[in-house]
Regions:
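Long, compositionally biased intrinsically disordered regions
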Residues: 112, 125, 129-195
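Divalent metal-dependent catalytic cores for phosphoryl transfer on phosphate-bearing substrates
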Residues: 1-127, 131, 140-144
Length: 195
C-alpha cells in the first residue's frame, strides 16, 4: 500500500504537466510531442531521486521505477504517429526507462495506475465502457510484455480485471438499466415470470 501511495512522487517536480493537476492552460500546448513525452517520463527518475533523498526503502523505490515499466507515453507516441505517419519515430523518446514490474504487487500497481488514468478520459461511465477500457488497457500491457517478469498468472490477471471493473463501477456509480413495462402494464422481468 505504501508503494502505491508513493509511486508518483516524481510528479511533484513539474505538477502542472500532469492532467490531474491542470485547470485551464495546458503547458504541453507549445511543446513538441517528444518534449512533452520526456517531461512526463521524467517523473519516474525524479521520483527515484526524491526517494533517495528521503531515504525511502528499496521496496518503495521498486514501485516508483516499475509503475510504467518499459511502456510508452502512449498519448504523445500515438499523437506523433497520427500527425506524422510518414516520418520515422524515435521510440526511445517515448519509452519509459523501466524496469518492468517483477513482483505481483508492482504488476498490480502498473495495471491499476494505467486503468485509473485512462478511466478519467471516458466520455460516459457505463458497465460496457468501463469493461472495455479495463480489458483494452490490461490486454495491451500483456501484449507489450510489460508483465512477463511478474509471477502473475493469466487467472490472476482475469481476477484483477474483474476487480478493477467492479471498483470503477462503484467509483463512477454506474447503474443497471431498469426494464420498461410492457403494454399490459406488467414488467417483462417480473418475479411472476421467474416462479
Amino acid at each position: 500500500r505504501t508503494g502505491a501511495l508513493y509511486h508518483d512522487i516524481g510528479k511533484l517536480k513539474n505538477p502542472a504537466f500532469f492532467t490531474e493537476n491542470q485547470s485551464g492552460f495546458n503547458p504541453h500546448t507549445p511543446l513538441s510531442f517528444e518534449q512533452s513525452a520526456q517531461i512526463v517520463i521524467s517523473h519516474v527518475n525524479d521520483g527515484l531521486k526524491m526517494a533517495d533523498k528521503l531515504r525511502l526503502p528499496q521496496a518503495i523505490k521498486d514501485f516508483i521505477s516499475t509503475h510504467h515499466g518499459h511502456g510508452k507515453a502512449k498519448f504523445f507516441y500515438n499523437s506523433f504517429c497520427n500527425k506524422y505517419p510518414d516520418q520515422p519515430v524515435d521510440e526511445s523518446k517515448f519509452t519509459y526507462p523501466g524496469p518492468n514490474p517483477f513482483t505481483k504487487e508492482t504488476g498490480i500497481l502498473m495495471m491499476a495506475d494505467a486503468v485509473e488514468a485512462a478511466s478519467r478520459s471516458l466520455k460516459e461511465y457505463t458497465n460496457e465502457s468501463i469493461s472495455q477500457l479495463v480489458n483494452r488497457i490490461i490486454d495491451s500491457q500483456v501484449a507489450d510484455g510489460l508483465l512477463r517478469d511478474t509471477p502473475l498468472s493469466f487467472r490472476d490477471v482475469e481476477t484483477i480485471k474483474a476487480t478493477f471493473i467492479e471498483k470503477l463501477k462503484t467509483i463512477y456509480h454506474t447503474r443497471i438499466s431498469y426494464p420498461e413495462l410492457n403494454k399490459n402494464g406488467k414488467n417483462d422481468n417480473s418475479d411472476e415470470k421467474r416462479q
